[in-house]
Amino acid sequence: MNVAIDFSKCPRVPGRAYNGANGKKIAVCYDHSVWMLKFPSSAAERPNELSYSNSCLSEHIASTISNIIGVKAQDTCLGVFVVGEKTRVVCACRDFTDGGKVFYDFCSVKNTVIDSDTNGTGTDLDDVLDTIDKQTFVEPVALRDFFWDMFVVDALLGNFDRHNGNWGFLVDANTRQVEVAPLFDFGSCLLPQADEKIMRRILDDKAEMDARIHLFPMSALKKDGRKISYVDFVQTNRLGVLERSIAKIVPRIDLQVIFNFIDQVSLLTELQREFYKRYIQARYEALFVSR
């Protein structure tokens, strides 16, 4: 089993800061690279919202699964960080802008399409696809393929917060070469609000499991003003580009390989291991087996 890394003594990297609503983030130097440490949100930070105490676990597990099935995502590892008298679980994410690259999120690129009537934050599916076709950062056909690959990954992992600010492009500051950035920000996957009591209830009650596959979480993308249901959309749509992504990615989803990885993740309880494995299997079967 992998051993959790203690990042407490790693030197902080000056001049690096990261945005985002879910938890604190700092940059440290570890193993000769820059890593962003993501801390789970505390109740004091989000007093009116559900706890995201498992978001760091979700970030690492989901990012690694994306890489396992061949859709490039950030490199991550789990660790701990001592804050005062408390030891916090953190997810370390390798900073893919290290080395002179600049990240532009899709929201910013969407704002460059000046003949669009919507702003950068809009997540209407047709509008997003229209922007993909009109943007000039990368070749539109290749970006459409990437977008639907990302959709398939998010569907498998139950990501309810893939918005225009957490995917995008890397531009080399020297050569101006542009590439699609690795996928990141997976903290809203795999039911991060579920504590062990909720996990046990979901495992013991098929109706509870089914609700968290067919009713929620939904995609942040919208169709006709309503959030898209992952299962309904995958089951009923035969869009050529989505079909290509499914045909490409689903054969790579080896559940036993994923389960073996989860068994090696440090800091998980046995209940959490069982939950993540059964939840991923249930989503996989609902999305892809019965098509």
Predicted regions mapped to residue ranges:
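Conserved ATP-binding subdomain of kinase catalytic cores across diverse folds
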Residues: M1-D115
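Conserved kinase catalytic-core segment
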Residues: D126-D195
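ATP-dependent phospho-/nucleotidyl transfer catalytic cores
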Residues: R94-F151, F259-S266, A286
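Aromatic-acidic/polar surface patches that form glycan- and anion
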Residues: N54-C56, A142-F146, T269, R273
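A short, terminal or domain-edge coil/loop segment
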Residues: N2, K9-P11, D126-P140, D195-I198, ...
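C-terminal catalytic region of ATP-dependent kinase domains
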Residues: N67, D172-R291
